[in-house]
Amino acid sequence: METRYNLKSPAVKRLMKEAAELKDPTDHYHAQPLEDNLFEWHFTVRGPPDSDFDGGVYHGRIVLPPEYPMKPPSIILLTANGRFEVGKKICLSISGHHPETWQPSWSIRTALLAIIGFMPTKGEGAIGSLDYTPEERRALAKKSQDFCCEGCGSAMKDVLLPLKSGSGSSQADQEAKELARQISFKAEVNSSGKTIAESDLNQCFSLNDSQDDLPTTFQGATASTSYGAQNPSGAPLPQPTQPAPKNTSMSPRQRRAQQQSQRRPSTSPDVLQGQPPRAHHTEHGGSAMLIIILTLALAALIFRRIYLANEYIFDFEL
């Protein structure tokens, strides 16, 4: 198998390491890749004690993506159990249905312990979940020991080590329960954060809608009051613009654009009359006055020249 894959690939390195760590079965779980496919594993887990699955041995498949461990695997149960559908990708916080909660530090062993820890929990309508009665689950637990996988040839009777009553078994059970609790809490935190963000966004949209729904008379009175405070000189007030009829099919972005266009200041002549003269108007007035003075001075010089010429002619005739 090693010659068929690129040993420099992070996914291949990781899966080779995990295959060596999980080579020996335990009394609670076992998993190994297929001989011809490193990215498909078959696993076997024992049902958690003190539950409806006590005494059951369940078999399934784990399909890993090429981006593993950056992306989560897909988990498929092959043994009827009453908690997960057979032959369908189940929806867990460690499966491909929830890549947002997956952590690259998790491994296939983490997935096996999570499956054991999630089996006694309620499905709550998740994809691939079932809610059989306790009697049906106990019957399926007894029947699961006779299952034999055609893909890998594993028989449930001898694939796991015999169950022991000791610290090792109880430690594995506690680890599975604690892992399932932590994963469930992480998923709840992520979903609650997403819900809060969506509620804030909806509240923002509803606030914009409430501004659109204000009565026309109230909007006109508000505009008149604000303009009177800014223009105490008594200039004629501009007539408030009637808003266009609200279109319920408009998107939030279109509604915001419409509001911004309505809030732009008016540029009517009445409003411009109340504005103070600009500075460049004074500069133009000074230039015009200077031109007039120079013109008058030039005219005076011309008249003086004409007067002196006429006076010289009069003296010459005398």
Curated annotation (Swiss-Prot):
Catalytic activity annotated for this protein?
S-ubiquitinyl-[E1 ubiquitin-activating enzyme]-L-cysteine + [E2 ubiquitin-conjugating enzyme]-L-cysteine = [E1 ubiquitin-activating enzyme]-L-cysteine + S-ubiquitinyl-[E2 ubiquitin-conjugating enzyme]-L-cysteine
- Lumenal-side segments: 304-318
The UniProt regions of compositional bias labelled Low complexity, in chain numbering, are: 249-269
State whether keyword Ubl conjugation applies.
yes
Q: Which UniProt keywords apply?
A: ATP-binding, Endoplasmic reticulum, Membrane, Nucleotide-binding, Phosphoprotein, Transferase, Transmembrane, Transmembrane helix, Ubl conjugation, Ubl conjugation pathway
Query: Quick one: which pathway?
Result: Protein modification; protein ubiquitination
- Domain of life (superkingdom): Eukaryota
Does the keyword Transmembrane helix belong to this entry? yes
GO molecular function terms listed in the Swiss-Prot or TrEMBL record: ATP binding; ubiquitin conjugating enzyme activity; ubiquitin protein ligase binding
Membrane-spanning regions, if any? 283-303
- GO cellular component term, pick one: Hrd1p ubiquitin ligase complex
Q: Which residues form the active site?
A: 91
What does the entry give for GO biological process? ERAD pathway; negative regulation of retrograde protein transport, ER to cytosol; protein N-linked glycosylation via asparagine; protein ubiquitination; regulation of macrophage cytokine production; regulation of tumor necrosis factor production; spermatid development
- UniProt note: phenotype after gene disruption: Deletion mice have reduced viability and fail to thrive early after birth. Specific components of the ER dislocation machinery are up-regulated. In addition, males are sterile due to a defect in late spermatogenesis.
Q: What is its main location?
A: endoplasmic reticulum
Q: Where in the cell is it found?
A: Endoplasmic reticulum membrane
Q: What EC class is this?
A: transferase
Q: Where is the UBC core domain?
A: 10-168
As for what it does, the entry says: Catalyzes the covalent attachment of ubiquitin to other proteins. Functions in the selective degradation of misfolded membrane proteins from the endoplasmic reticulum (ERAD) and is essential for cells to recover from ER stress. Plays a role in MAPKAPK2-dependent translational control of TNF-alpha synthesis. Also acts as a platform for perinuclear positioning of the endosomal system by mediating ubiquitination of SQSTM1 through interaction with the E3 ubiquitin-protein ligase RNF26. Plays a role in male fecundity through the interaction with the E3 ubiquitin-protein ligase RNF133.
Query: What is annotated about its quaternary structure and interactions?
Result: Component of the HRD1 complex, which comprises at least SYNV1/HRD1, DERL1/2, FAM8A1, HERPUD1/HERP, OS9, SEL1L and UBE2J1. Interacts with E3 ligase RNF26. Interacts with E3 ligase RNF133.
The UniProt family comment states: Belongs to the ubiquitin-conjugating enzyme family.
Q: What is this protein called?
A: Ubiquitin-conjugating enzyme E2 J1
The taxonomic lineage of its organism, from the top, reads: Eukaryota, Metazoa, Chordata, Craniata, Vertebrata
> Which gene is the coding source of this polypeptide chain?
Ube2j1
